[in-house]
Amino acid sequence: MPKMKTKSAAKKRFRVRPGGTVKRGQAFKRHILTKKTTKNKRQLRGSTAVHETDMGRMSQMLPGRGI
């Protein structure tokens, strides 16, 4: 059976941490920012981990990465 290919879109958007969790960027930070408070925009600045219910999909999109 051939190797599974990594999804290019997932490769650009996600990073696998050493512990096996997956790091992702925050959504809702691209446009229409005038309605959002300064506190809200500041909290959206950092990255966060992918939820455990989505980890099955992550392991399919990023095979062979220790997820």
Curated annotation (Swiss-Prot):
GO terms for molecular function: structural constituent of ribosome. SUPFAM superfamilies: L35p-like. GO terms for cellular component: cytosolic large ribosomal subunit. Keywords: Ribonucleoprotein, Ribosomal protein. InterPro entries: Ribosomal_bL35, Ribosomal_bL35-like, Ribosomal_bL35_CS, Ribosomal_bL35_sf. PANTHER family: 54S RIBOSOMAL PROTEIN BL35M, LARGE RIBOSOMAL SUBUNIT PROTEIN BL35M. Belongs to the bacterial ribosomal protein bL35 family. This is Large ribosomal subunit protein bL35. It comes from Albidiferax ferrireducens (strain ATCC BAA-621 / DSM 15236 / T118).
